[in-house]
């Protein structure tokens, strides 16, 4: 059954991810295709509160499918965590007669969308826009593939200089408690060790592994480390321990940081964003809401937002096994 929609709002929230622009473009053009007015909201939930809205049309989103960042900007809004500011957001949405909202972001952003619907009846659809790949109900989140490729390209370059100087490099990648980037980028770049939160390796085991590698003839090594709660927490802890116990190693630390969030999205992320954006509007038209769109077995699916934001996505056990076998 097709639902009658007044107007649709779209925003990007939280940490940016490559492909957000392509998703915004798809939402806007899908709305226009279905004769529905679409408004962009600047700076995420902050824009909902301060009334920073702009009406968008098909031509207004020209030539952004290939661009990184987000034309709508993004922000983390502490105010939106409070009921009184969510009520203010509803007042502003009513001002523009917007009754449906597509939120592109990670678990915090989707939580905000869910609360807005539960408290004020605004129909919400989530698009998983985060490089961390840590949401339940989708094989890939938007921007994850681009971040992986960025990380692998950077590690490849570090590998060159590590080999030239017989150095041991600890390289930190993003993930916010999720090891997906570290595991896949580490395998793709041929890392000797990959340290992820889901597999607590321990300092002594890492020490033994490096000694074994040295005996087998390895003169340089790459160790990929998933970030902790704060940037550098894990990578400096591991590197300091090895430096104390293997002082003959020449050790360097490299934190890839925010380059993983930037850059032109890969073809995979552009196509994924386009599919997710169209599917988000389709969901609203079919009277679905408070769900996140995702991709499973190359098919568009939906999952309740409440489920999507809980737990995190399990690592592929076969990939962990592959890593153990080929990193000797």
Language-model segments: which ranges?
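Short glycine/serine/threonine-rich phosphate/pyrophosphate-binding segments
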Residues: 17-27, 49, 82-87, 101-114, ...
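Short, ordered loop/turn segments at secondary-structure junctions
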Residues: 13-16, 41-47, 76-77, 106-107, ...
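C-terminal non-catalytic interaction/assembly regions of soluble proteins
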Residues: 240-328
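N-terminal phosphate-binding or glycine-rich loops at protein starts, especially the Walker A/P-loop
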Residues: 2-49
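A glycine- and small-aliphatic-rich helix-loop capping segment at beta-alpha/alpha-beta transitions
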Residues: 25-34, 54-60, 115-126, 142-145, ...
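Glycine-rich oxoanion-binding loops at beta->alpha junctions
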Residues: 2, 48-103, 108-109, 142-149, ...
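Accessory alpha-helical/coil subdomains and C-terminal extensions
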Residues: 38, 103-105, 111, 115, ...
């Amino acid at each position: 059954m097709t639902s009658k929609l007044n107007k649709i709002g779209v925003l990007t929230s939280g940490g940016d991810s490559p492909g957000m622009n392509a998703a915004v473009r798809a939402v806007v053009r899908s709305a226009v295709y279905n004769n529905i007015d679409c408004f962009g909201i600047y700076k995420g939930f902050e824009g909902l509160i301060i009334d920073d809205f702009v009406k968008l049309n098909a031509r207004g989103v020209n030539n952004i499918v290939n661009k990184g960042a987000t034309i709508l900007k993004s922000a983390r809004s502490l105010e939106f965590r409070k009921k009184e500011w969510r009520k203010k957001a509803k007042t502003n949405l009513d001002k523009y007669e917007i009754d449906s909202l597509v939120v592109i972001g990670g678990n915090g952003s989707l939580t905000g969308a869910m609360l807005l619907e539960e408290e004020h009846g605004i129909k919400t659809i989530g698009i998983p826009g985060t490089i961390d790949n840590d949401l339940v109900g989708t094989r890939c989140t938007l921007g994850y593939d681009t971040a992986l490729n960025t990380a692998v390209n950077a590690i490849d370059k570090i590998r060159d200089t590590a080999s030239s100087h017989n150095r041991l490099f600890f390289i930190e990648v993003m993930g916010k408690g999720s090891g997906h980037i570290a595991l896949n980028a580490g395998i793709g770049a041929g890392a000797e060790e990959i340290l992820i939160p889901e597999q607590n390796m321990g300092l002594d085991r890492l020490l033994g592994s490096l000694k074994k590698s040295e005996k087998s003839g390895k003169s340089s090594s790459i160790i990929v480390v998933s970030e902790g709660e704060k940037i550098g927490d894990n990578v400096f802890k591991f590197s300091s321990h090895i430096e104390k116990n293997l002082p003959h190693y020449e050790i360097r630390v490299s934190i890839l940081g925010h380059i993983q969030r930037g850059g032109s999205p890969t073809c995979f992320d552009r196509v994924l964003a386009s599919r997710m954006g169209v599917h988000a509007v389709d969901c609203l038209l079919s009277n679905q809401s408070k769900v996140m769109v995702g991709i499973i077995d190359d098919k568009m699916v939906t999952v309740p937002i409440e489920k999507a934001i809980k737990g995190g996505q399990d690592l592929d056990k076969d990939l962990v096994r592959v890593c153990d076998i080929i990193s000797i």
